[in-house]
From Swiss-Prot:
Protein name: Lysis protein for colicin E8
Protein purpose: Lysis proteins are required for both colicin release and partial cell lysis.
Subcellular location: Cell outer membrane
Keywords of the record: Cell outer membrane, Lipoprotein, Membrane, Palmitate, Plasmid, Signal
Coiled coil start-end: none
Species this chain originates from: Escherichia coli
Lineage: Bacteria, Pseudomonadati, Pseudomonadota, Gammaproteobacteria, Enterobacterales
InterPro entries assigned to the protein according to its UniProt record, in alphabetical order: Lysis_col
Amino acid sequence: MKKITGIILLLLAVIILAACQANYIRDVQGGTVSPSSTAEVTGLATQ
């Protein structure tokens, strides 16, 4: 029974991390983050 709880917690952690990462990537591509030299290097330069 304890193993199932651990698996569920692990899945929740992965889902939360993935959601945060998706939000961060969307923010960067949306241009809400101020454009910097790193944005140009990675190819996400704003038009």
